[in-house]
A protein has these predicted regions:
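Short loop segments at secondary-structure junctions
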Residues: 44-48, 58, 125-130, 145-147
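Conserved N-terminal beta-strand and adjoining loop/helix that marks the start
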Residues: 2-4, 27-52, 73, 104
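Conserved Nudix-box catalytic region and its N-terminal flanking loop in Nudix hydrolases
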Residues: 49-91
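A generic structural signal for short hydrophobic patches within well-formed alpha-helices
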Residues: 74, 148-149, 161
Length: 178
């Protein structure tokens, strides 16, 4: 599914391996090196998602107890989707099927986290019925869109939560790449 205003995209324009999309810079400003992070919105069903997994941070102390999407940094030379699969194996001990990418409603190709750090996010699913939090998280839990709004999300993840809720409400739940 393609959404020119952002949202979920199936067919992706692929970046050369090891490169990252760059955010627009004002004229005359040198772009800083950007670290790419990948995140997973683990849904109960890629074809018609009703719930997604929220993960409560265990550390560092200033983020402990806040909720986020599982994921992590892309290593040099690693493709973003390969990094996503690796991070989910490491953090949650799961193998996933990767669905569509969730993009911002802006011209940016990734979600800004903080200066020098941006995140690309995909919907994913797994066949594992039970998911344990691992060492990175205090707990994980399945939430509906309404329940998700009651959680204390990391500030950079809130726009992603809102986009997921918007996509689910709009019935754009067919989240498998074509």
């Amino acid at each position: 599914m393609e959404n020119s205003q952002g949202g979920a995209k199936g067919a992706q324009e692929t970046q050369p391996k090891g490169t990252q999309p760059k955010a627009a810079q004002p004229k005359g400003v040198q772009p800083k090196a950007t670290q790419l992070v990948v995140g997973a919105v683990l849904v109960d069903d890629l074809r018609q998602p009703m719930r997604f997994l929220a993960a409560q941070r265990a550390y560092p102390a200033q983020l402990r107890g806040q909720w986020e999407f599982p994921g992590g940094k892309v290593e040099p030379g690693e493709a973003p989707q390969a990094a996503l699969a690796r991070e989910l194996r490491e953090e949650l001990d799961i193998v996933v099927k990767i669905g569509v990418e969730v993009t911002p409603d802006t011209p940016l190709s990734a979600w800004p986290l903080k200066p020098g750090l941006e995140m690309r996010v995909w919907l994913v699913s797994t066949d594992r019925p039970e998911i344990s939090p691992g060492t990175s998280h205090m707990q994980v839990k399945w939430v509906t869109p309404v329940q998700a709004l009651d959680l204390n999300w990391l500030a950079p993840d809130l726009p992603i939560v809102r986009q997921i809720i918007k996509l689910m409400a709009a019935g754009q739940g067919k989240c498998v790449q074509s």
